[in-house]
């Protein structure tokens, strides 16, 4: 992945918990799990109003069975015997790059926000 440019208005930021952020940045977690089918492309990785990295996400993979969920475990690393969402999607992480910056988002924002 080319060096990320400074954040622009409208850039997408995935809001993550600290554990998942660390696993993605280390390269151990290669699939993010979401309840929505996010578009492929560039996303910044955010935690507590800071940017820690940038990823390129591939086309979303619908996860519809427990067997598929278990097979994908080495990529998503979510330790659960059931699907986490009624509609579950795996977002393949094609590349990741660490960086730091700050951003603000609306109070209580979860999941994904756009840079303002």
What is each model feature region?
Residues 2-116:
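Structured alpha/beta reader/binder surfaces that contact nucleic acids or chromatin modification marks
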């Amino acid at each position: 992945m080319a060096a990320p440019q400074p954040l622009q208005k409208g850039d997408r930021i995935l809001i993550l918990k600290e554990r998942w952020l660390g696993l993605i940045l280390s390269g151990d977690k290669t699939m993010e799990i979401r309840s929505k089918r996010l578009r492929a492309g560039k996303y910044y990785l955010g935690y507590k109003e800071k940017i820690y990295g940038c990823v390129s996400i591939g086309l979303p993979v619908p996860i519809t069975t427990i067997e598929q969920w278990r097979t994908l475990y080495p990529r998503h690393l979510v330790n659960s015997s059931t699907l986490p969402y009624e509609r579950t999607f795996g977002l393949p992480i094609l590349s990741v790059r660490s960086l730091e910056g700050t951003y603000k988002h609306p109070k209580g924002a979860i999941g994904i926000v756009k840079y303002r």
